[in-house]
């Protein structure tokens, strides 16, 4: 039977929620990943060092006994951010600030209204070596939802990179050929995370044969040509600029199967297996380890994980749902097969 052993991966973009939801989902990530970059869009958001340290303590308390998993904490960038906050964050071990343009995604109401007013704060991030994580979509109601990432590149990303050229930027969960091209053409201070859904699915998977609420995420799934461009980027000659970030975003089944359903796909349960499928289909299984376990650590300036995990070429059926607080959670590819299984 075919096996593949790789350095234990890191998830460089993860939503863990809080309370009972946190307790329900964190074990799935902790058994596959050594570390994860934890998104700060709680209600209320994680905006201060004290907020982040308290949230980290709650995550650690929710981990299975004996787990060596390490959460890497971030702060939610707001219009009120200061250079002093950046220095405090650096001193406390916070790895990054996350940009949510106001209204772009789940719990983004406190997000930034005008990033260009925060240029001195971004300059301090560059000076301190704190990363800037970007949800790269404009929120202008005039812009078609399928074009919001491409519009963000010209309106925001390129001007910011021109004004703060040494800022370390992660273009999060990229979904378009335009975003891949920006990262490929930018300096080594710009990288990107890519989710399993944007490497495996396109907008037909959301809209053909009925609306598929469990395939609804933001940024929304795009055309097949964009999916192919992402696969080419993560397996190509500049693949070192791209790394694993699931954007696994749990919402109760009742909140997804709804007249106004929530955006987000829960992939943490079988994340590594889903990515293995992508790389196998692309004839690039030899590049999975760098994407999952090396590129992100290098960009963040942290050592690779010490342990390994082993994937077996053995099919598994993903459960239709799993418990989630008082309700249930529908994982990515619920009820379907994945051709790989992580050995635990």
From Swiss-Prot:
Q: Which domain of life is it from?
A: Bacteria
**MF terms (GO), sorted A to Z:** dihydroorotase activity; zinc ion binding
Pathway where this protein functions: Pyrimidine metabolism; UMP biosynthesis via de novo pathway; (S)-dihydroorotate from bicarbonate: step 3/3
Which residues are Zn(2+) 2-binding? 98, 135, 173
Q: GO BP, one example? A: 'de novo' pyrimidine nucleobase biosynthetic process
* Gene3D superfamilies associated with the record: Metal-dependent hydrolases (3.20.20.140)
> Which keywords has UniProt assigned to this entry?
Hydrolase, Metal-binding, Pyrimidine biosynthesis, Zinc
Gene Ontology cellular component list: cytoplasm
Q: Give the catalytic activity.
A: (S)-dihydroorotate + H2O = N-carbamoyl-L-aspartate + H(+)
Membrane-spanning residues: none
Chain positions found as N6-carboxylysine: 98
Quote the InterPro entries the UniProt record gives.
Amidohydro-rel, DHOdimr, Dihydroorotase_CS, Metal_Hydrolase
Q: What does this protein do?
A: Catalyzes the reversible cyclization of carbamoyl aspartate to dihydroorotate.
Full protein name: Dihydroorotase
Q: Which gene encodes it?
A: pyrC
């Amino acid at each position: 039977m075919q096996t593949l052993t790789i350095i234990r991966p890191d998830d460089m973009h993860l939503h863990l929620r809080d309370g009972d939801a946190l307790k329900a989902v964190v074990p799935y990530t902790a058994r596959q990943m050594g570390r994860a970059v934890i998104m700060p869009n709680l209600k209320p958001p994680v905006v201060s060092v004290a907020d982040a340290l308290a949230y980290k303590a709650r995550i650690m308390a929710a981990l299975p006994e004996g787990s060596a998993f390490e959460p890497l904490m971030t702060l939610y960038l707001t219009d009120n951010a200061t250079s002093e906050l950046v220095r405090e964050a650096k001193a406390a071990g916070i790895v990054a600030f996350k940009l949510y343009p106001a209204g772009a995604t789940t719990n983004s109401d406190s997000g930034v209204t005008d990033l260009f007013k925060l240029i001195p704060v971004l300059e301090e991030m560059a000076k301190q070596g704190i990363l800037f994580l970007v949800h790269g979509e404009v929120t202008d109601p005039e812009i078609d939802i399928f074009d919001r990432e491409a519009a963000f590149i010209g309106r925001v990303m390129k001007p910011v990179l021109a004004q703060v050229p040494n800022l370390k930027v992660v273009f999060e969960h990229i979904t378009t050929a335009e975003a891949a091209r920006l990262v490929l053409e930018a300096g080594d201070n710009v990288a990107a995370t890519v989710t399993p859904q944007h490497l495996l699915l396109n907008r037909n998977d959301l809209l053909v044969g009925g609306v598929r609420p469990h395939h609804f995420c933001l940024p929304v799934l795009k055309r097949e040509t964009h999916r192919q461009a992402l696969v080419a980027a993560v397996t190509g000659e500049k693949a070192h600029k791209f790394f694993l970030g699931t954007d696994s975003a749990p919402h109760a089944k009742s909140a997804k199967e709804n007249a106004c359903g929530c955006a987000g796909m829960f992939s943490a349960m079988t994340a590594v297996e889903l990515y293995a499928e992508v790389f196998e289909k692309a004839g690039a299984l030899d590049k999975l380890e760098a994407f999952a376990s090396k590129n992100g650590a290098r960009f963040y300036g942290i050592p690779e994980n010490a342990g390994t995990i082993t994937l077996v070429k053995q099919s598994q059926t993903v459960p239709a749902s799993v418990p989630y607080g008082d309700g249930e959670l529908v994982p990515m590819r619920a009820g379907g097969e994945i051709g790989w299984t992580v050995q635990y």
